[in-house]
UniProtKB/Swiss-Prot annotation:
Name of the protein described by the UniProt record: Large ribosomal subunit protein uL16
Domain of life: Bacteria
Subunit structure: Part of the 50S ribosomal subunit.
Lineage: Bacteria, Pseudomonadati, Bacteroidota, Flavobacteriia, Flavobacteriales
Gene Ontology cellular component annotations, sorted alphabetically: cytosolic large ribosomal subunit
Protein's job: Binds 23S rRNA and is also seen to make contacts with the A and possibly P site tRNAs.
Length: 139
């Protein structure tokens, strides 16, 4: 699963997800992609599940690019522990996804294959998504 090799600080504050995605809102590698319509934390497990769903359907044809990376540590205190006594340990890693962010890109396959592969991938993600096609695409 994806996670940073090393970070400057072990823990982060939760932060707020307001506004639209400032970067990563255009297709850069592939011809087809899925764009986020909501804001949410997408965990490393969800990204991996979506990747597996898409690659299984594509049967090793074409290429898939994951355009989000889980670089935010999400902490959790153990069960039945009273409040206070510091912040909990890092439980998992998540990527902050805002509306407009391209999450996955696919290239080298026909449109119907890409559409179905990305639909299967989108079912594994906690955000509403939209299928997008590159401007210079010709069938």
């Amino acid at each position: 699963m994806l996670q940073p090799k090393r970070t400057k600080y072990r823990k982060q504050q939760k932060g707020r997800m307001k506004g639209l995605s400032q970067r990563g809102h255009r297709l850069s590698n592939g011809t087809f992609g899925i764009k986020s319509m909501d804001s949410s934390f997408v965990t490393a497990r969800q990204i991996e599940a979506a990747r597996i769903a898409a690659t299984r359907y594509m049967k090793r044809e074409g290429s898939i690019w994951i355009k989000i990376f889980p670089d935010k540590p999400i902490t959790k205190k153990p069960l039945e522990v009273r409040m206070g006594k510091g912040k909990g340990a890092v439980e998992y890693w998540a990527a902050v996804v805002k509306p407009g962010r391209i999450m996955f890109e696919i290239g080298g396959v026909p449109m119907d294959v890409a559409k179905e592969a990305l639909r299967l991938a989108a079912q594994k993600l906690p955000v509403r998504t939209k299928f997008v096609v590159a401007r210079d695409y010709q069938e």
